[in-house]
Amino acid sequence: MKASEEEYRLNFFIKNDFKRKICKSCKTPFWTRDEKKEYCSDIPCTDYYFFDINIKSQPLTVKEAREKFLSFFEKRGHTRISPKPVLARWREDLYLTIASIVDFQPHVTSGLVPPPANPLVVSQPSIRLEDIDNVGITFGRHLTTFEMAAHHAFNYPDHYVYWKEETTAYATEFFTKELGIPEEELNFKESWWEGGGNAGPCLEVTVGGLELATLVFMQYKITDNGNYTPLKLKIVDTGYGVERIAWITQKTPSAFHAIYGNLVYKFFNKIGVAYIDETLLKVASRFAGKIDPDNPDTIKIHRQMVSKELGIDIKAVEEELDRAAKVFQILDHTKTIMLMLADGLVPSNSGEGYLGRLVIRRALKVLRLLKSDVRLYELVKEQIDFWKEDFPQVLKNKDYILDAVELEQQRFEKILEKVPSIASTLARKSEITTEDLIQVYDSNGIPPDLLEEELKKKSVKFELPRNFYALVAKRHQTSTIKSAYDKVKLPKDMLEYITALQPTEKLYYKDQYMRSFEGKVLGVYKNYLILDKTTFYPEGGGQLGDTGLIIDEKSSKRYEVIDTQKVNDVIVHILKEEPSTIKVGDNVRGEINWERRYRLMRHHTVTHVILAAAKKVLGEHVWQAGAEKTPEKGRLDITHHKTLTEEEVKLIENYANSVISDRRQVKPLEMNRMEAEMKYGVSIYEGGVPNSATIRLLEIKDWDIESCGGTHVSNTSEIGAVKIINVERIQDGVIRLEYVAGPALVDYIRETQAKIVEASKIIGTSPDQLTSRLRRILNEIEEKNNLIIQYRRIIETELLNNLKPYEINGNKIYIIEGLGDEEENKEILRKLTSTDNTIAISISDNRLQIATSKNMRVDKIVEELLKGGGKGGGKGTFANVILNSKKSKEEIIEIVRKSL
């Protein structure tokens, strides 16, 4: 959609002598006080010429630029609020905080929840990976991490705050009065913004080739069919670039110098790259506005312009600028890595962890291309020391950040050992596509740049996409939200039936210990029953739905409830049979299976206890990745970068049992969503993100507070005790803890004791002697195994000395009877085929192992063998085959003869 000219024809512009002009280059309308201006002052229409503008402000660091912006708006009636983490954990559809408006999506922008203040001002650290491949090349125009300083106003139908006129006036005052930019240099470029399902006209503020801010006026919702409908809530969504404000006041040759100061020189030194010639850098930066990274020709033209201007050989210019760009990339990426990990990201192969690993591996790749020996964690440590006052969480989580980065580098180095074999596989393809390269990266973690050299050795050419990492990041930057209907275990016809029913009153929130109740029937459909109120808890938050009885008060007939589910606010009781005596309007009595429910309450409560204990032992990066509470046990999946040690498990268990022994109060709270976020942070959403203005929190006194809709005990002492019974790494970056509490712990102890007694009987000893007896048995087994190995070596030697080969066309074919051990057979076959033109086959019933010498291939032999029926295969010089029927030596020799 394109807005009309009237959307931008503001009284502010008219009163302050701004003229509407059309840019001579891009043909975009813009507003300026300079009547002679022909260009919009944005690149690529102009070069960077802000270096030449007389700006009255003293040079500002990033910290000073941030504070100047926040203070300016604070003095003008805006409430300063704290930024959110760079991980958007209050959103289920987005992994990273890409802009300040994300702080308020979807619940504030939809009108469900009021903002924390109105108007407000914030400086939000943000991460965008869509430009990751462009970082460094444009001298700081593109970054993966940046601070979006923003003032927001939320205009309701009955409450106007401010809109376009005031927003434009604020921007003009800030840039001209606060920063001292000459009024004639300030331009407002007409544009259109869309994002997150919303849209609106916007003005881009440009000065000297640099876009300093975007003023968005969010006023439309984009419908599913692509139409635009007006929003009831009209939002001022601004974004000022803190780093660009610092850059324009410092006038450094790159934004990296303005952002990182002396850290730039330190990185060049640590990485082992000579610092770029200052004159070359200044000239290259001035012409950098001409670079469109998506068009490689513009990069080439830029380098030619620099070469011509300085009279330097083009190759020397390219080499020096390429090296500098790589160092700038590492500066940018290490800050992004630091912020991601400080806010709790655990590198992995999925979700937000995938994006973190992508940035880490890109930084490692660049270091490798620069042939640098510096460890990545050393550079991240420099970033922590530099930013620790701006972002206190980076210092608090320093140990985890550095440990995770070093572990990732070790894993990456191990992965690179696969490069030759992966390159060999790719080399066999007739054409290597971008999709092939993405598949290799996703499956093996190998960047295509590092495959390039290996493929060149094989004379294989392929086109490496310039935006490779952006393409990969785009595929992984969002997650799919399931609707309430997708999450429940109910048939479609049942979901349609309940749409007209009123919400169910949740008695289990009024009294979690209520065991029975009376309710009125609102709906009966097959074996599904809906009441006006219930104390049956529906499955949710990892807690199983309640079971029990529904009693028809007229006939006294009892119906077993086998499960309870919820769709939106309607609770559905699933009965074992259709309730033939119950109809709509009847009164019924409900009784929950209390023993089962109480077990679930204990396991649900102890899950909160263990999660907080894990954070205390392992670090603040621990985040709930999943949970399940059954009557038999609890299960908690947590994010962590390493396998847990026995000592760590013991500490988690000890902390949990200490909290149980402390008899701490467990109390549910209801709070306004934004108030809860401001008070406790987004960690309250560990168990999921509820879609409501008011959220239910569970507080364990002085231990944990988290959003949770489950049922819990009222005091930790009711849990009794907890035992962690299993710990395993279920996927990259995720550890699963299983545990039992209360009566389930007693059951576990009984079962374990029974197994110990049974094991003791089997080996003929008493339970107290079981350990020592097992050690003796294991020692005996080890001794016997050593004897077996010795005997096998004797047999192997005898076999190799006495075995006579068959001769076929100058090839030797050995046939041996299998020894019953596949690895032993494989070793013998390997020795037999150590010389050229040799085939060795081990036969064990209808199973064959086939090996050939290095100058032969096994494929044709396997193909010939399988003609008679069977399965199997292999590659290169070894294969396993299972035939449909056993064959004699003579038959196998004949088959081999045919294959040769």
UniProtKB/Swiss-Prot annotation:
UniProt KW keywords: Aminoacyl-tRNA synthetase, ATP-binding, Cytoplasm, Ligase, Metal-binding, Nucleotide-binding, Protein biosynthesis, RNA-binding, tRNA-binding, Zinc
BP GO annotations: alanyl-tRNA aminoacylation
Binding site for Zn(2+): 604, 608, 708, 712
Catalyzed chemical reaction(s): tRNA(Ala) + L-alanine + ATP = L-alanyl-tRNA(Ala) + AMP + diphosphate
Compartments in which it is found: Cytoplasm
EC number: 6.1.1.7
SMART domains: tRNA_SAD
GO cellular component: cytoplasm
The keyword rRNA processing appears for this protein: no
Sample GO molecular function, one term: aminoacyl-tRNA deacylase activity
Cofactor: Zn(2+)
InterPro entries recorded: aa-tRNA-synth_II/BPL/LPL (IPR045864), Ala-tRNA-lgiase_IIc (IPR002318), Ala-tRNA-ligase_IIc_anticod-bd (IPR018162), Ala-tRNA-synth_IIc_core (IPR018165), Ala-tRNA-synth_IIc_N (IPR018164), Ala-tRNA_lgiase_arc (IPR022429), Ala-tRNA_ligase (IPR050058), Thr/Ala-tRNA-synth_IIc_edit (IPR018163)
Chief location: cytoplasm
Domain of life: Archaea
Entry's cofactor comment: Binds 1 zinc ion per subunit.
Listed PANTHER family: ALANINE--TRNA LIGASE, CYTOPLASMIC, ALANYL-TRNA SYNTHETASE
Family: Belongs to the class-II aminoacyl-tRNA synthetase family.
Purpose: Catalyzes the attachment of alanine to tRNA(Ala) in a two-step reaction: alanine is first activated by ATP to form Ala-AMP and then transferred to the acceptor end of tRNA(Ala). Also edits incorrectly charged Ser-tRNA(Ala) and Gly-tRNA(Ala) via its editing domain.
Written domain comment of the UniProt record: Consists of three domains; the N-terminal catalytic domain, the editing domain and the C-terminal C-Ala domain. The editing domain removes incorrectly charged amino acids, while the C-Ala domain, along with tRNA(Ala), serves as a bridge to cooperatively bring together the editing and aminoacylation centers thus stimulating deacylation of misacylated tRNAs.
Protein name per Swiss-Prot or TrEMBL: Alanine--tRNA ligase
Organism whose genome encodes this protein: Saccharolobus islandicus (strain L.S.2.15 / Lassen #1) (Sulfolobus islandicus)
